[in-house]
Structures are given as structure tokens and as C-alpha cells.
Amino acid sequence: KELLDSDGDILRNGGTYYILPALRGKGGGLELAKTGDETCPLNVVQARGETKRGRPAIIWTPPRIAILTPAFYLNIEFQTKDLPACLREYSRLPREEEQHSEVKLAPKEEAAAFGXEKLKPYRDDYKIVYCEGGSDDDSCKDLGISIDDENNRRLVVKDGDPLAVRFVKAHRRG
């Protein structure tokens, strides 16, 4: 079955979307933030304000097909327009830190060695799952939110407590 955006339209391979929480009152869309002593915003976080959409992301899969389904491994890349210069050569990947694996940016050449994500139906929306090393669905783990000491709502590999998401076209008017 095809993946759908918030308008009920089919999610397009290479399309640009805001990734927003499905439930109201749980923060805004996904964006990038500096945490700790970082000089560049490398962490994928949920915007603190519920009305903030976050940063647009391109959702794509290497097979050149138009329509995305839950069967495909996906790449989710934040748009490079207006990104700080320190991020231009970075891609997204989970990285082990403390209790959870945070979703952080790393150099693109390192990213190829890590697993991919899939979008899975979850309640009436979707959840993003991380499949280490591109392994089978049984070993895929949910991506959820963990609040750190600085009140950042970090996206982490947190099996069993997923962030329910929906996708809003970045170019949508109104």
C-alpha cells in the first residue's frame, strides 16, 4: 500500500515534506539543533513550539520509482538550502550515545556504512523505524523522542515508544 501525506496524496520519491508529529501538543516538526558544546547543528530534534514546522526534508529511495511504500528503505535528508556551511557535506544517521542512539548528522562518506529507515503504518499515521545495516523488518527499531538536560527533544532509536508522524508538502500553500 502507498504512503500518503497529510492531504491524502501519495508520498513521492524525491518529494520535499515537513515531518510533523501526528499528535497535537507534542512539539513541532523535525529540525536540526546544536547540543552540548557542538559548534554545528548536528542533532535531529523536534522543534519546541507546536506551531513550528521544522526543516523541510527530501524523502527518497535509490530505486527510481515514483511511489513510495512501506517496503522500501528510505533516505531522509534535510534540504541544504539555508544550511550553515558546516553542514553542506553531511547526511543523517543514528549514532550511539548514552542510553539511546541519537539521530545525528555525520559526513556522507560515513553514512553509507549505516542502516536505513522505513516508514511503517502506525495507528492512523506513520512511524519511522531504523533498520541497522539494512537488516530485515524484525530487527527494525522505532524512532522516538528523548528529552535531554537542555530540554532538547532529540530523535533517538527508542524501540517501543515511536514518534507518530505525518508528512506535509513543503510547497503547500495556506
Curated annotation (Swiss-Prot):
PROSITE patterns per record: SOYBEAN_KUNITZ
Thermal behavior of activity: Activity is retained when heated for 10 minutes up to 60 degrees Celsius. Inactive at 100 degrees Celsius.
Lineage top rank: taxon: Eukaryota
Cited CDD domains: beta-trefoil_STI_LlTI-like
Residue pairs linked by disulfide bridges in the UniProt entry: 40-86, 131-140
Pfam families linked to this entry: Kunitz_legume
Family matches, as SUPFAM superfamilies: STI-like (SSF50386)
InterPro entries in UniProt: Kunitz_inhibitor_STI-like_sf (IPR011065), Prot_inh_Kunz-lg (IPR002160)
Keywords, comma-separated and alphabetical: Disulfide bond, Protease inhibitor, Serine protease inhibitor
One GO molecular-function entry: serine-type endopeptidase inhibitor activity
Family: Belongs to the protease inhibitor I3 (leguminous Kunitz-type inhibitor) family.
Subunit structure: Heterodimer of an alpha and a beta chain linked by a disulfide bond.
Biological role: Inhibits trypsin and chymotrypsin with a 1:1 stoichiometry, with dissociation constants of 1.56 nM and 120 nM respectively. Inhibits plasma kallikrein, factor XIIa and plasmin with dissociation constants of 5.0 nM, 150 nM and 18 nM respectively. Does not inhibit factor Xa, thrombin, tissue kallikrein or cysteine proteinases such as papain and bromelain.
PANTHER family assigned to the protein according to its UniProt record, in alphabetical order: KUNITZ TRYPSIN INHIBITOR 2, TRYPSIN INHIBITOR A
Name of this protein: Trypsin inhibitor
Organism: Enterolobium contortisiliquum
